[in-house]
């Protein structure tokens, strides 16, 4: 071995990377370390009598060290005795300081720092053999040996005479039997390993807990008679919404149900009612995700009132089905062909944008007067779906006597008591709070015969068809007590709503003379006498032939059965008093037509002679505040 340079004098500090080892670590666990004294170094020529002994001494030391590692309960004094028999003690005393050996080489040697480089070949394997205990020590599982906590607990239980121990007795056995835990029995240092013991007792299937017979005593821990698993059992977890199989099954069923409902809705999208269900502001225009909770946990019934989306497909019922008492006679007039319809409520038409979109789609092309339009022709691509009742004018229906209007003599404006028919048709209430009878717009615009017999009664045989068209086109709203006068030319009549110069009341939107009023406010009628200054929201229909007062019943404007001659129409109605109309103003004000505003319709159309080839043009005016 080449000689290393001389070390510094004894008073000089040593490099911290190559700090000398202390002597007590040479023979203690886990690995003996040689002591390097900087004041004394090995000599290249030690005593000759000590040269053949290091090899044999290393063999004995390694064998004793391997026995020491496998033994769990070892005595530190025995380890010191082994190292005391080793010749390195005498070598250290006899050797003078030798500066030639390098510190790294000294660190590589194990307990023989003074072995010279000129040793015999028998002593040369000793540094290599000293590395083997270091490899074997790295395989130790725990600080006390190769035994695990479960093995120690098993030994503790087996060592007891009754083959059972409580938790505190297991703690005591650990402190008494395992040297590593002897100085760790106090409360501060025992928290960690005691917690590990509790975990191993509860997680291993080889340990079984037995209830103690005595009251207030700890349970016994015994070994599993069936043996159990040597390893740990799978970790137990509390049932939650993520790993609960019951919740997963219910969630899967809800997903399947949603898929089937969506497929059924897609299959029914070809119905005529679905082509206008996505108009802006309608409840159907919202996505199906908004009602996912409803569709998942609450099944929809067949009732139209419980339908969430508000989409109603037209259904062709039989003639006999509509003869029941639950069908409102005002909503469904007696006719040969009937068709239910869906109309958006006026509360959804509260802004001008929705109204413009609605009225732009309301283009009804009228056929010639010689042809009668069928109900199917009125299913237009528009926001409203108007259906026609019986457009043919026949004999007065026998059920018409159900409308109990008081017929007066020649007074154009008189008190008319009404019989309120309860509305039992729950399916029609799903339309909205402001329903409009079906077929009115088409019947007023396209029919060349007088309107239906529940609108105008054939009490005056002298009424011609032209005059009935003038009557239909001159239907208007009279929001005040003063009724303006309109001309009777059939080609220049316009239908509009004109607020009077007096303070206007809450206007009721009128579509071709029919008022869309709240279906609960007008039912509560009271005998309130009104004067000129009191605004009257009752709709008045006027023609050149006479005046037909219109009453309201459940939100529908109906023409009273009044036989009036053509010559009795006053030329100026500005000074006429409206004294005998009964109206509950409080209910009208309370149940305002709109929350956001009020609707104002204006249908400007020029009527040609005996035909209506034009479409109705609509404009939206500014809202009149109520």
Curated annotation (Swiss-Prot):
Biased composition (Pro residues): 1-11
Low complexity: bias regions: 37-48, 101-133, 262-277
A GO CC term attached to the entry: cytosol
GO MF terms, alphabetically ordered: chromatin binding; DNA-binding transcription activator activity, RNA polymerase II-specific; sequence-specific DNA binding
Post-translational modification comment from the UniProt entry: Phosphorylated by AKT1; insulin-induced. IGF1 rapidly induces phosphorylation of Thr-28, Ser-240 and Ser-303. Phosphorylation of Ser-240 decreases DNA-binding activity and promotes the phosphorylation of Thr-28, and Ser-303, which leads to nuclear exclusion and loss of function. Phosphorylation of Ser-313 is independent of IGF1 and leads to reduced function.
Compartments, as annotated in UniProt: Cytoplasm; Nucleus
GO BP annotations, alphabetical order: cellular response to cold; cellular response to hyperoxia; cellular response to starvation; energy homeostasis; fat cell differentiation; intracellular glucose homeostasis; negative regulation of apoptotic process; negative regulation of DNA-templated transcription
Family matches, as SUPFAM superfamilies: Winged helix' DNA-binding domain
Protein name: Forkhead box protein O1
Organism (species): Xenopus tropicalis
């Amino acid at each position: 071995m080449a000689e290393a340079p001389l070390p510094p004098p004894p008073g000089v500090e040593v490099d911290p990377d190559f700090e000398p080892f202390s002597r007590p670590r040479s023979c203690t666990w886990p690995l003996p370390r040689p002591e390097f004294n900087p004041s004394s170094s090995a000599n290249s020529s030690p005593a000759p009598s000590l040269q053949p002994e290091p090899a044999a001494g290393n063999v004995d030391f390694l064998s004793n060290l391997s026995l020491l590692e496998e033994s769990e309960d070892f005595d530190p004094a025995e380890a010191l005795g082994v190292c005391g028999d080793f010749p390195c003690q005498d070598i250290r005393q006899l050797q003078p300081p030798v500066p030639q050996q390098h510190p790294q080489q000294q660190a590589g040697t194990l307990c023989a720092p003074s072995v010279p480089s000129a040793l015999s070949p028998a002593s040369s394997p000793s540094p290599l053999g000293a590395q083997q205990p270091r490899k074997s020590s790295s395989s130790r599982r725990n600080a006390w040996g190769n035994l695990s906590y479960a093995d120690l607990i098993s030994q503790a239980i087996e060592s007891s005479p009754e083959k059972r121990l409580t938790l505190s007795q297991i703690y005591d056995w650990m402190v008494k039997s395992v040297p590593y835990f002897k100085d760790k029995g106090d409360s501060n240092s025992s928290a960690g390993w005691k917690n590990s013991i509790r975990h191993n007792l509860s997680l291993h299937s080889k340990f079984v807990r037995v209830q103690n017979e005595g009251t207030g005593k700890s349970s016994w821990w015994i070994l599993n008679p069936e043996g159990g698993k040597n390893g740990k059992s799978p970790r137990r977890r509390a049932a939650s919404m993520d790993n609960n199989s019951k919740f997963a099954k219910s969630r899967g069923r809800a997903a399947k149900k949603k898929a089937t409902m969506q497929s059924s809705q897609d299959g029914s999208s070809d119905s005529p009612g679905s082509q206008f269900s996505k108009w802006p502001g309608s409840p159907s225009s919202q996505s199906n995700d908004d009602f996912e909770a409803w569709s998942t946990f609450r099944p929809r019934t067949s009732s139209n009132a419980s339908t969430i989306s508000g989409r109603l497909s037209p259904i062709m019922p039989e003639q006999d089905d509509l003869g029941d008492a639950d069908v409102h006679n005002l909503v469904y007039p007696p006719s040969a062909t009937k068709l239910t319809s869906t109309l958006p409520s006026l509360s959804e038409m509260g802004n001008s944008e929705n109204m413009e979109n609605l009225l732009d789609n309301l283009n009804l092309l009228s056929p010639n007067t010689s042809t009668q339009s069928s109900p199917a022709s009125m299913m237009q691509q528009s926001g409203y779906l108007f259906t026609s009742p019986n457009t043919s004018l026949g004999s007065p229906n026998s059920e018409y006597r159900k409308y109990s209007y008081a017929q007066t003599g020649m007074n154009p404006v008189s008190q008319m008591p009404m019989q309120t028919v309860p509305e039992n048709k729950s399916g029609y209430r799903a339309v909205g709070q402001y329903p409009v009878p079906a077929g009115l717009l088409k019947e007023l615009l396209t029919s060349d015969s007088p309107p239906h017999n529940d609108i105008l009664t054939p009490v005056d045989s002298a009424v011609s068809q032209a005059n009935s068209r003038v009557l239909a086109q001159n239907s208007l709203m009279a929001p005040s007590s003063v009724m303006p006068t309109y001309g009777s030319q059939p080609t220049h009549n316009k239908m509009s709503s004109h607020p009077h110069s007096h303070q206007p009341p809450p206007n009721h939107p009128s579509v071709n003379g029919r008022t869309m009023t709240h279906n609960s406010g007008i039912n509560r009628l009271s005998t309130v006498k009104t004067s000129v200054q009191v605004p009257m929201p009752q709709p008045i229909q006027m023609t050149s032939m006479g005046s037909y007062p219109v009453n309201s019943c459940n939100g529908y404007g109906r023409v009273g059965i009044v036989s009036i001659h053509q010559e009795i129409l006053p030329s100026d109605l500005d000074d006429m008093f409206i004294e005998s109309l009964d109206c509950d103003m409080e209910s009208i004000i309370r149940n305002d037509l709109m929350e956001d505003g009020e609707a104002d319709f204006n249908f400007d159309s020029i009527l040609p002679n005996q035909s209506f080839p034009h479409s109705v043009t609509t404009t939206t005016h500014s809202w009149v505040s109520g």
